[in-house]
Design a protein with these regions (language model features):
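Active-site and donor-binding regions of nucleotide-sugar-utilizing enzymes
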Residues: 5-150, 163
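N-terminal beta-strand-loop-alpha-helix module at the start
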Residues: 1-24, 30, 183-198, 204-213
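A nucleotide-sugar donor-handling region in carbohydrate enzymes
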Residues: 125-208
């Protein structure tokens, strides 16, 4: 079975390995890195069935990328950035080919409840911007959807992978909610080797603060 992961940041890569090591260690996993500065150099996994490839950091949601993905005949596609028209274009068309589309938590985006003024107007403006971006790339979705601030609401998303399923303010209809596997020693060793840091952290008499880079 083949799986595709679309990643942009170190956090995405870390979470991808959490999913792979727990659920898909015996499958063929293709990690596509769309990052200009965040993830540099060669990314090579210790698992022989994990393959990394590069994409442009923007404007990769085009027909040629879609065809490349189709050749892989994936069972699942995982992506993190819900506000990316590139990801939405690719996910929509792969879902039409019966590929399972999984949106994976990126930060705390799944959990807020939005009470913005003129919420509908903002949704319409962002929907227009989405379609404008796609048309500029000659990338077409032959249906109209209205962008929503409700996380993962788009109907062609099949699964939501989140750290805290019980904290979701709502569950979109017909979505399967899956907890992201916990970080384990195998994943720590894997990412420490990839990013070249020591897997152990001194904890005596220090305060460890971890924030988003």
């Amino acid at each position: 079975m083949n799986n595709i992961f679309l990643v942009h940041t170190e956090y995405h890569l870390l979470t991808t390995f959490r999913v792979i090591f727990d659920k898909y260690k015996d499958d063929n996993n293709f990690i596509y890195i769309a990052s200009e500065h965040r993830i540099q150099g060669e990314i090579k996994s210790s698992l022989p069935n994990v393959h990394t490839r590069r994409l442009p950091h923007i404007n990769y949601g085009v027909y040629s990328t879609l065809k490349e993905f189709e050749i892989l005949n994936p069972k699942n596609i995982f992506f993190f950035q819900y506000n990316s028209s590139d990801n939405i274009y690719l996910s929509y068309h792969l879902n039409k080919l019966n590929v399972n589309v999984a949106l994976v938590q990126d930060g705390l985006k799944p959990y807020p409840i939005w009470h913005r003024r003129f919420l509908l107007l903002n949704c319409l403006k962002e929907t227009f911007e989405f379609y404008k971006q796609m048309f500029r790339r000659w990338a077409v979705i032959p249906t109209l959807f209205i962008k929503s601030y409700k996380y993962g609401k788009l109907r062609f998303i099949n699964q939501l992978w989140v750290d805290y399923p019980n904290k979701l303010p709502y569950i979109p209809n017909k979505k399967e909610i899956i907890p992201i596997p916990l970080l384990n020693d195998d994943v720590v060793i894997e990412v420490s080797r990839i990013f070249k840091f020591k897997p152990s952290v001194p904890l005596n008499n220090i305060i460890l603060y971890i924030g988003q880079p």
